[in-house]
Regions:
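Short, low-complexity N-terminal intrinsically disordered segments enriched in polar/charged residues
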Residues: 2-9, 16-47
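Surface-exposed, charged secondary-structure patches
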Residues: 26-30, 78-116
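Short, well-ordered alpha-helical segments enriched in acidic and aromatic residues
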Residues: 47-60, 64
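Short beta-strand segments enriched in hydrophobic/aromatic residues
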Residues: 57, 111-113, 137
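Short beta-strand edge/turn micro-motifs at domain boundaries
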Residues: 119-141
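Solvent-exposed, acidic/flexible segments
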Residues: 27-35, 46, 50, 70, ...
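A short gly/proline-enriched turn/hairpin at secondary-structure junctions
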Residues: 61-71, 84-86
Length: 141
């Protein structure tokens, strides 16, 4: 009887430990407000920080460049950011929250380089995963 109880206890401990390893990592950006999500986006694009990109972009994320008509999905844009990991843009970056209502937020980020200016219009949406970047539209005024 004692051996059966020990075996059952060992089985429960093994199941519990295997379950803890199988759990997916929690989203570290889940509790951030829209302002901090915009800052995280800018850190990814202008400073090459790709640590939280998996959680930063919504599943239906799209990136559009008005100047050349390019459009990219989440997978394509994350691959681009990963390829340019660590690359820091030599620009002055400012941003502002244009509007936030309910589950949607619109922000504008301006990156001033020596010879040109890049403006990103960033749309964020809030879901159970918290605020995420759902669309970016880049212009060069």
């Amino acid at each position: 009887m004692k051996r059966t109880v020990t075996t059952i206890a060992a089985a429960f401990i093994m199941i519990a430990s295997f379950s803890s390893f199988a759990a997916e990592k929690a989203n570290p950006l889940r509790n951030l407000d829209s302002k901090n999500i915009v800052l995280s986006y800018l850190e990814a694009t202008t400073a090459g920080n790709v640590v939280w990109n998996k959680h930063l972009f919504a599943e239906d994320f799209t990136y559009s460049n008005v100047a050349n008509g390019d459009n990219f999905s989440k997978k394509q844009y994350r691959a681009f950011l990963k390829a340019t990991k660590g690359l820091k843009y030599d620009c002055t970056t400012t941003y502002e929250i244009l509007d936030e209502a309910g589950q949607t937020c619109m922000a504008k980020a301006t990156m001033k380089f020596d010879n040109f200016t890049r403006v990103d219009y960033i749309t964020l949406s809030k879901s159970q995963e918290g605020w995420q970047v759902s669309k970016v539209l880049t212009t060069y005024p």
